[in-house]
């Protein structure tokens, strides 16, 4: 594998690892949620993640992030690692799983809007179309998983919506920090900030941990080490190499994977409409991450100045003519995107 293909494959692999582990987090949260309250679970998860990330930072001798990165680290740490974790755990106790999945999946749409407004992210038609298809799939998944018995409270819906807003704000604020600090630094110190925000729940964590079954505690540790420490680092690595909008659209694969993991791990057989929604989610991600091909128009007698081939500008990879005869080859350069 050459250097250029490796630079393209690694961010894609990082994004895949992220969505797989984040999907597994929903299963683990359900397993640990019976023994731990929302705040205690969030604090335990952040502490486990901070220990794992801190050890990795020491091994790699990463050091402190540059001053320019701290604003983004602090904001994303408070919003995403702190506030989001608590309100999501709390909201999932107030509404059924389908309603929670439906409301939280407003997040990627908010990321696209905030990314375009605050970061100047481009909004190509393929990205918009893919997000529309994925959101439709998330709606189908949410409605098919909803209990329909009126068990979803207004408070629960508001909490899940706040989680989506915090998620979007955390992603958009994290992106600039990755311009001056490494993915590991941004994730480690963001996780530490989140742990500090959750410290008011320390008393609950100590009390509940003393009587919680070992399996629930192991689920909490798993949440900290894998969906937090590892997945947030691979997320930051991929985010540093593409736009916030594009990465946000990628997370629409999570509902489909949650359905699959619930089927395999919890023996919850999905309904036909749930499977259809999952397929739509994945199809939308594929569309949003696809790129249009460049078209190179060669005109014999009507060649450009100095006998160069005429290149028709279109959206997609950049093409550059190579000096040489009129019929010479064209080298295609693709931007390093996930």
PLM-predicted stretches and their roles:
Residues 53, 74, 114, 123-145, ...:
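Hydrophobic transmembrane alpha-helices of multi-pass small-molecule transport proteins
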Residues 1-46, 90, 149-176, 197, ...:
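Glycine-/small-residue-enriched transmembrane alpha-helix faces in small-molecule transporters
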Residues 53, 111-113, 117, 131, ...:
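Transmembrane alpha-helical segments that form core, pore/gating elements
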Residues 21, 25-29, 54-104, 140, ...:
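Specific transmembrane alpha-helical segments of multi-pass solute transporters/efflux pumps
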Residues 24-31, 35, 48-66, 90, ...:
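Membrane-interface helix-cap regions at the ends of transmembrane helices
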Residues 43-44, 99-106, 173-196, 224-264:
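Helix-helix packing/entry segments at the starts of transmembrane helices
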Residues 34-83, 108-110, 114, 165-173, ...:
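Transmembrane alpha-helices of multi-pass small-molecule transport proteins
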Residues 2-4, 46, 142-145, 216-218, ...:
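C-terminal-most transmembrane helix of multi-pass membrane proteins
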